[in-house]
A protein has these predicted regions:
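S-adenosyl-L-methionine-dependent nucleic acid methyltransferase catalytic domains
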Residues: 1-239
Length: 239
């Protein structure tokens, strides 16, 4: 959950009472006064000293985890990753992007994976307390990944944008036909957009510098806005 939920911190509430009752029964499980937290893979600024250090910790740990998955993956079968994360998007000079998704996708790509698709799965109840009156996810997004070929080609930024504009409309139409909730569309569109981005070993800008994941996400969101605007232009007055 990146920085959304600190399960180790929450577990301390129960741990102290369990330890009091059970440490003589299962002493090996209750050797510490509180829940161990150093290996928990979350981006908690107070634990690491700053947001940047917390982000670096998450990126490094997630890269190592994903690399182990990539090393064990069989070429005949995809790896599916369940990553239920919702974060308010940030506006920068590069466009709109989400740090949680950016960091997770960066780790996935660094591990040698290419994203081949996404599947939105309705996992959340519409009447749950957390979701009432808020813009929370109605579905969770499953990413489908495969090892990126060692001979994957490079592309220019213009070629990447052209491919996005060519392929994203069909992908969005498919997602909409699957009855995905509108609040989840931007999250789900990351998959087909990143499928284009990760098919290349690198996407280079006009100066020959590699396009970052944040820049790619901003371009995907921009293209998504264009696709949705075109769809609205086709509606009749009643719609």
């Amino acid at each position: 959950y990146y920085d959304n939920i600190g399960y180790a911190d929450l577990s301390d509430f129960f741990y102290v009472w369990l330890r009091r009752s059970l440490r003589r029964v299962v002493p090996d499980l209750f050797t510490t006064l509180a829940v161990p937290k150093t290996e928990e893979l979350v981006a908690t600024p107070y634990r690491h000293g700053s947001k940047d250090k917390a982000n670096a910790f998450f990126l490094d740990g997630m890269t190592r985890a994903m690399r182990r998955l990539a090393d064990q993956a069989h070429p005949a079968f995809p790896v599916t990753v369940y990553y239920a994360f919702k974060q308010s998007e940030s506006q920068t000079g590069e466009g709109t992007a989400s740090t949680g998704w950016e960091t997770f996708l960066g780790a996935t790509i660094r591990a040698g994976f290419a994203i081949s698709g996404t599947w939105p799965i309705r996992t959340e109840l519409g009447n749950r307390i957390l979701g009432q009156g808020t813009n929370t996810l109605a579905s969770s997004i499953v990413l489908v990944c495969r090892r990126r070929p060692d001979d994957a080609p490079t592309a220019t930024r213009r070629e990447f944008i052209t491919a996005l504009r060519s392929e994203l409309p069909r992908a969005i139409a498919h997602l909409q036909r699957s009855n995905i909730a509108p609040v989840d569309l931007a999250q789900a569109a990351i998959g087909p957009g990143m499928a284009v981005y990760t098919r290349y070993s690198e996407v280079l800008d006009a100066e020959g510098c590699a396009l970052t994941v944040r820049e790619a996400l901003a371009l995907i969101n921009e293209t998504l806005d264009e696709v949705l605007s075109e769809q609205e232009g086709e509606f009749d007055a009643d719609t």
